[in-house]
Amino acid sequence: MNLTEGRVVFEDVAIYFSQEEWGHLDEAQRLLYRDVMLENLALLSSLGSWHGAEDEEAPSQQGFSVGVSEVTASKPCLSSQKVHPSETCGPPLKDILCLVEHNGIHPEQHIYICEAELFQHPKQQIGENLSRGDDWIPSFGKNHRVHMAEEIFTCMEGWKDLPATSCLLQHQGPQSEWKPYRDTEDREAFQTGQNDYKCSECGKTFTCSYSFVEHQKIHTGERSYECNKCGKFFKYSANFMKHQTVHTSERTYECRECGKSFMYNYRLMRHKRVHTGERPYECNTCGKFFRYSSTFVRHQRVHTGERPYECRECGKFFMDSSTLIKHQRVHTGERPYKCNDCGKFFRYISTLIRHQRIHTGERPYECSVCGELFRYNSSLVKHWRNHTGERPYKCSECGKSFRYHCRLIRHQRVHTGERPYECSECGKFFRYNSNLIKHWRNHTGERPYECRECGKAFSHKHILVEHQKIHSGERPYECSECQKAFIRKSHLVHHQKIHSEERLVCSMNVGNSLAKTPTSLNIRDFTMEKVYH
């Protein structure tokens, strides 16, 4: 039986750079690369990938290039003899470290694991086997550092157990969470899962502290790694490192149509469909064609109703994983997209793009009728109804239609009697927030509307508008009976009562009684005209 069948080996998760790509990385990025390699190795080790048969050769002993041509498989930094896993602190780890070029170190220098502090033996020279006694005890409480000498030694104390990031340069202090293996029983207990790390949030248990620490980021929403090229944040350094290849890697496959380049040929092939219009995937249910298989698969769920992705927090189901990931940010509070102008964070990239138009002043949506420009497509859609007269929102109670949904919601309170806005001073309730704001000025005495002519201030805008007619001489309300004009509509209404009373008296045909009361009518007429002129 093949013991390696179905296993994930280090080669499967390794990330490689060409010499040119390696040259583009700064010191922090190179250290991060080492961090990622250590994380991957620690994870594989925790799964038992290198604790098999005695004669099984560690995959890393075959060697691999990390962008420095002098350091290759033909020149291994450790002994080429096979080393049993129980005799070292993890042979694959040594090969990784010795192949990473440290900034400021000559390519011929190498990086080794320092076992002097770990296992109380002197530093070994290049090519010598590193071994330990039977009664080894890792000292988890010590502070270790990177030794810069002819050979570079990196302490990987408890490398299988601790997160790789804590071992890179210097342990910050005693790791009380992780206990040393005092004897064989302790080591076996850890491997059998008896000493687990339990998550206090969801109750999950982990045998590897690295996995435990990484898991906790799901609950905290922590994204420690920020790309200084595009501002994206990443939860795990491995994902961050993979993303950075987008900026540093060569794009050798170029589209002849638009000049766009791609890292992989299959991506170029997919892209070409944009120009050719090819849509090879057809839906048998509705006959629609799709450019990409992933889009086709998602579309089919519309017909089947399948929602295979479930949110563990609220139990909601989603058609695709990307929608689930976006939804989960509601629970975690994660906002991975940052605006470089104002520092604001956003949950979705589409929201960031919309927001950035505030800074750029971009208004990409133009009305084809009047030429007005809008920042958002939704604003253009609403504006378009001014030209079409469309009123898509209809009240089910009275049949009245409205142009905007918010107007329908406001209107429906007339039927329901709902008055959701309460004055904290007098307890009065109002149907609309605007009415509450106006009412509040009765308590505060605020008069925000001032007349530019005389300086008089008013609490409501409509009172100011009527007042300004005194200065302008405008009399927009005219009596149809006698053509007299008035400043306010209320004045016209009162005036029109004079004419209605006259008609009433005439219709009664009281004869001489009309002659007896002209004075009273004249006085009333005079009084009304005096008041409302």
From Swiss-Prot:
Encoding gene (name): ZNF548
Gene3D superfamilies referenced in this protein's UniProt entry, alphabetically: 6.10.140.140, Classic Zinc Finger
The organism of origin for this protein: Homo sapiens
C2H2-type zinc-finger residues: 197-219, 225-247, 253-275, 281-303, 309-331, 337-359, 365-387, 393-415, 421-443, 449-471, 477-499
Similarity-based family: Belongs to the krueppel C2H2-type zinc-finger protein family.
GO terms assigned for molecular function: DNA-binding transcription factor activity, RNA polymerase II-specific; RNA polymerase II cis-regulatory region sequence-specific DNA binding; zinc ion binding
Protein name: Zinc finger protein 548
Glycyl lysine isopeptide (Lys-Gly) (interchain with G-Cter in SUMO2) crosslink residues: K516
Cell location: Nucleus
Main location: nucleus
GO cellular component, one term: nucleus
UniProt keyword Metal-binding, yes or no: yes
Single Gene Ontology BP annotation: regulation of transcription by RNA polymerase II
Keywords tagged on the record: DNA-binding, Isopeptide bond, Metal-binding, Nucleus, Repeat, Transcription, Transcription regulation, Ubl conjugation, Zinc, Zinc-finger
Protease keyword on record: no
Function field: May be involved in transcriptional regulation.
Residue ranges of domain KRAB in the record: 8-79
InterPro entries hit by this protein: KRAB (IPR001909), KRAB_dom_sf (IPR036051), Snail/Krueppel_Znf (IPR050527), Znf_C2H2_sf (IPR036236), Znf_C2H2_type (IPR013087)
A Pfam family recorded for this sequence: KRAB
